A protein has these predicted regions:
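C-terminal regulatory/interaction module of P-loop NTP-utilizing enzymes
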Residues: 1-281
Length: 281
């Protein structure tokens, strides 16, 4: 089973190599990179390309590792016991299978996405070490050992909000998705907007990378935000020439709210771009 790329996702050679290396080693692929660089979509497209189901576990700050295995609803069982419900005699009625259990019990290999693992507390990755390494876990309430019928292809994404434990890192294959250069970005845009006029693409790309290169910017726009912006430009039929105005009143690009998400960044960009374009006039 090998990933050969996807017509809906621009995968660089090194990224494709990393995916296949993780599959060969049967280790989770830990993917880091700026927000909006396609870390989550990578798992989606790999699943589509390989023709296997996708299971997604989106991590929050309150998520516990146990939830990925299973949860035992003791409160509901106690309530049913008090009401004389017949369901109470079978403990399986009160066990909710987590994403790892679903992946382990699947009748065919699946892609399992553990998304934004760094949002959880620092012990979260360590609490999954044994389960991801041995592909099994024990259910104490039913005294059964759950083993993976087929080893899932595991993708783990991180935005680098927290450092991950060394013991966890040793069990992963790592890849950092670098922010796309202009050539790669044009390919990405081409996948989403194949009929986009070259003039609009050229001007939009110039503005986008100009925004990203502004020193002191609090939040640089991401790939996904560029795609949102282009979608709006097309919907509003904004011409290419409107993106490069030298007029102080219109120097900020139309619909800039898709790119700049902070008022200080808007003012900073406006000031620097006006000075740059005024010099070039």
């Amino acid at each position: 089973m090998r990933f050969q790329g996807s017509s809906n996702y621009v995968s660089t050679d090194d990224l494709t190599l990393a995916v296949n290396a993780a599959i060969t080693l049967q280790r989770p692929l830990l993917v880091k990179g700026e927000p909006g660089t396609g870390k989550t979509m990578l798992a989606v497209e790999v699943a589509k390309s390989l023709g296997v189901p996708l299971l997604e576990w989106h991590i929050k700050s309150t998520t516990k590792a146990q939830q990925g295995l299973y949860e035992y609803d003791a409160v509901s069982r106690l309530r049913d016991s008090q009401l004389g419900d017949e369901r109470v005699h079978d403990i399986h009625n009160y066990i909710v299978k987590g994403m790892l259990w679903q992946a382990f019990s699947a009748e065919r290999p699946v892609v399992l996405l553990i998304d934004e693992i760094d949002k959880a507390d620092i012990e979260f990755p360590n609490d999954l070490l044994r389960e991801l390494d041995r592909m099994e876990f024990y259910v104490y309430e039913t005294r059964e050992l759950v083993k993976a019928r087929h080893r899932p292809i595991v993708f783990i994404t991180s935005n680098n909000e927290k450092e991950l434990p060394d013991a966890f890192l040793r069990r992963c294959f790592f890849h950092y998705i670098r922010f796309p250069d202009k050539e790669t970005m044009e390919k990405i845009v081409g996948v989403h907007f194949p009929a986009l006029k070259k003039s609009l693409l050229r001007e939009a790309m110039e503005v986008f990378f100009e925004v990203r290169e502004v020193p002191g910017l609090k939040k640089k726009p991401s790939t996904s935000e560029l795609l949102d912006w282009l979608k709006l430009l097309l919907a509003e039929d904004i011409p290419a020439e409107a993106l490069r105005s030298k007029d102080r009143k219109t120097i900020i690009p139309p619909l800039h709210g898709a790119l700049l998400k902070n008022e200080q960044d808007v003012h900073l960009f406006e000031r620097l771009v006006f000075m740059t374009r005024a010099k070039g006039a």
